[in-house]
Amino acid sequence: MICYNQQSSQPPTTKTCSEGQCYKKTWSDHRGTISERGCACPNVKPGVKISCCSSDKCNG
């Protein structure tokens, strides 16, 4: 499976993942809305939105 793994302000990059899932999580801080992408489907802190999916590059 191929997942995107860049932070919100970075150009898109991908990674081959063995976990079978990709995630995109978003949160807000003093810089505005931040997003992070990667492999698996991690637990997140309250106030962080996460969406997980299970197809190539689905977390764009």
Swiss-Prot record:
GO molecular function list: acetylcholine receptor inhibitor activity; ion channel regulator activity; toxin activity
Keyword Secreted listed: yes
Q: Which UniProt keywords apply?
A: Acetylcholine receptor inhibiting toxin, Disulfide bond, Ion channel impairing toxin, Neurotoxin, Postsynaptic neurotoxin, Secreted, Toxin
Task: Describe, from its UniProt entry, the tissues in which this protein is expressed.
Answer: Expressed by the venom gland.
Q: Name one GO cellular component term.
A: extracellular region
Lineage: superkingdom: Eukaryota
Which Cys pairs are S-S linked?
3-22, 17-39, 41-52, 53-58
What subcellular compartments does it reside in?
A: Secreted
**What CDD domains has UniProt attached to this entry?**
TFP_snake_toxin
What protein family is recorded?
A: Belongs to the three-finger toxin family. Short-chain subfamily. Type I alpha-neurotoxin sub-subfamily.
Annotated function: Binds to muscle nicotinic acetylcholine receptor (nAChR) and inhibit acetylcholine from binding to the receptor, thereby impairing neuromuscular transmission.
Q: What is this protein called?
A: Short neurotoxin D1
Q: What is the lineage of its organism?
A: Eukaryota, Metazoa, Chordata, Craniata, Vertebrata
